[in-house]
Amino acid sequence: MLIDWFTIVAQIINFLILVFLLNRFLYKPIVKTIKARQQEIENRWQDAEKEKKSAKNEANSYQKKQQELEEKKQEIMIQAQTKADEKYDNLVEEARQDVEQKRKTWDESLEREKAQFFDRFQEKIMQQIYKITGHVLGDLANASLEQQIINQFIHRLENLSEKERENLANSLNTTDNGLIIRSHFEISPESRNRLLSSLQQTHIYQGDNVQFMTNSDLICGIELQASDYKIAWNLKDYVEALEI
């Protein structure tokens, strides 16, 4: 059997040409298309992963912001509650202080009114005692109450302590107004002379600058004043001394 080398070579050449043509016009485009498709898929996959990661980050960020907002909300609520409590406490304290001040003012007003009432009451009682005592003494001893008060005051002057004499002398040295003698009633000229004579005999005051005045507050009483120092005897002081 003879081998036709020409035919074999021609077929080999045709095969190679066919392989080249197939590779050039069929396989390479297909492979290129497949690779391009794979690259596209890979790119889409990577994009999807990126979007997934981004979405996850956004979700985490949103969750974090939500948590921060919740914490801020709680903080604001706590602050608001604290301020509300402080405001309530302040209002309660202001109300308490206002009530306390009003109560104190009311108590002080009540005390003043009570003191004024008792002062007026005592004043009226003293006046009644003054009138009644004057009538009683006048009826029983044939002497007026005024005269008895003068006698009692002269006795008081005659028995001054050394300290009282010293204080009176010091006060007389600090004033040019002399002495002032006040009484609830008008002192008669005769009683005035008795008082002046007593002042000279007891060496309390040798001058003649003595003023006689009336004072309705001296219930059943009489007082001697030199500058800011005074010596007094009256029923009102006597009663107050008994109260103390």
UniProtKB/Swiss-Prot annotation:
Membrane topology according to the record: Single-pass membrane protein
Entry's Gene Ontology molecular function annotations: proton-transporting ATP synthase activity, rotational mechanism; proton-transporting ATPase activity, rotational mechanism
Major subcellular site: membrane
The name this protein goes by in its record: ATP synthase subunit b 2
Transmembrane regions listed in the UniProt entry: 2-22
Pfam family, one: ATP-synt_B
Assembly and interaction partners: F-type ATPases have 2 components, F(1) - the catalytic core - and F(0) - the membrane proton channel. F(1) has five subunits: alpha(3), beta(3), gamma(1), delta(1), epsilon(1). F(0) has four main subunits: a(1), b(1), b'(1) and c(10-14). The alpha and beta chains form an alternating ring which encloses part of the gamma chain. F(1) is attached to F(0) by a central stalk formed by the gamma and epsilon chains, while a peripheral stalk is formed by the delta, b and b' chains.
Family (UniProt): Belongs to the ATPase B chain family.
Compartments, record wording: Cellular thylakoid membrane
Gene that produces this protein: atpF3
Recorded superkingdom: Bacteria
One GO CC annotation: plasma membrane-derived thylakoid membrane
Keywords: ATP synthesis, CF(0), Hydrogen ion transport, Ion transport, Membrane, Thylakoid, Transmembrane, Transmembrane helix, Transport
Species per Swiss-Prot/TrEMBL record: Crocosphaera subtropica (strain ATCC 51142 / BH68)
Function noted in UniProt: F(1)F(0) ATP synthase produces ATP from ADP in the presence of a proton or sodium gradient. F-type ATPases consist of two structural domains, F(1) containing the extramembraneous catalytic core and F(0) containing the membrane proton channel, linked together by a central stalk and a peripheral stalk. During catalysis, ATP synthesis in the catalytic domain of F(1) is coupled via a rotary mechanism of the central stalk subunits to proton translocation.
